[in-house]
Amino acid sequence: MANRIIGVLAAVAVFLLGGLQARSETIPATDARVSYIGRTLSDNGSVSFDWTGVYLKVRFEGSSLSIRLSDSKKNYYNVWIDSSMDKAPDQVVATFGNDSTITLFSTPRRKAKQAHQIILQKRTEGSQGRTTFHEFVTDGVFVQADGPSERVIEFIGDSYTCGYGTEASNKERFSPETENQNLTYACAAARYFGAEHIVMAHSGMGIARNYNGKVTEDNMTARYLNTFDSAESPAWKPSEAGLKPDITVIYLGTNDFSTGMQPAQRVFVKNYIQLLKEIKEFYGEEHPVLCMVPKHDILMLEYIKKAVDTCSLPGVHFLALSPSVHNNEEDMGADGHPNYSGHKKIAYTVIPCISTITGWELSTNPIQ
């Protein structure tokens, strides 16, 4: 009788253990249940990207979630757990090394009775490295993550759009830890409209001339065509993206006019029109584009307005920021770049223009 009881208990233990093991799941980063926003490249089950602001959503039923990844340098990511991107992140994680594992969520199993959704957003830019996600692991099961919004805004920019130094004080120098793309005018404007945001931005880049440099072919006009910020190939194919933006916003020119210099007007205008043509080739001739003029230089306004007026392309709009759009003390972060307060003020300026161009109604939504 004792032997029989032991045998039954052993069978029950094996059954329970098998049940627990059966509920654990590992999926490749390319699994269709994971939702990505931004330019990525899928290869052999892994997903690679380096543009700032790329984000993903993954949903699971279980008590833990980890991700296996590699990074060519060191990046920082915002992590939201059962929350939204208009809130402060629940944690910030660093990605580095080859084939490393990061635990994003862990809670006692008895409390894991519902589905959890994790949002993971790259807060640093391409110069900090390329991240490759290999697989996700949970002790439960994966379910379909939230899909993208019906509204999508594309932003092309420089350090302002990257969120360079947004979390630093105006007396601090830049460090990668203080860069946070989520605290930019771009993300604030997109959130106001309930839109997804796709960002191509790199600090120091211009239309024809980069910061403290000469006229160069390595500029945002060229990089916009690439899948990766840090590599010329492969070329980006919008047809494979799955998302088509409703509007593209360009916020470039500051670096062209940096350190008391600027390119010849004909060179700048030629490159700016080339960027406009690239956008139209991606999304169609009627695709709307909003060209923002930074507040720094009146000559820059003349250059960009000349490009808009002479491009002979439909749906190209113009917005010049006033020098008083934000102040240079309380609204500033590292190295003369706006903090979150300054970025929200820029968002307040651009939102009415996006509303007019797209037909999206203004609302009482907070700008955050």
What are these regions (language model features)?
Residues 1-26:
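Bacterial Sec-dependent N-terminal signal peptides
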Residues 17, 67, 258-261:
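A generic structural signal for short coil/turn motifs at secondary-structure boundaries
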Residues 20-156, 160-181, 359-368:
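N-terminal secretory targeting modules
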Residues 104, 210-213, 331:
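Short secondary-structure transition/capping segments
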Residues 123-128, 166, 171-263, 295-301, ...:
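Conserved SGNH/GDSL esterase-like catalytic core that processes O-acyl groups on lipids
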Residues 155, 197-199, 318-320:
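Conserved beta-strand scaffold positions in the cores of enzyme catalytic domains, especially
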Residues 222-367:
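Alpha-helical cap/lid subdomain in secreted, periplasmic
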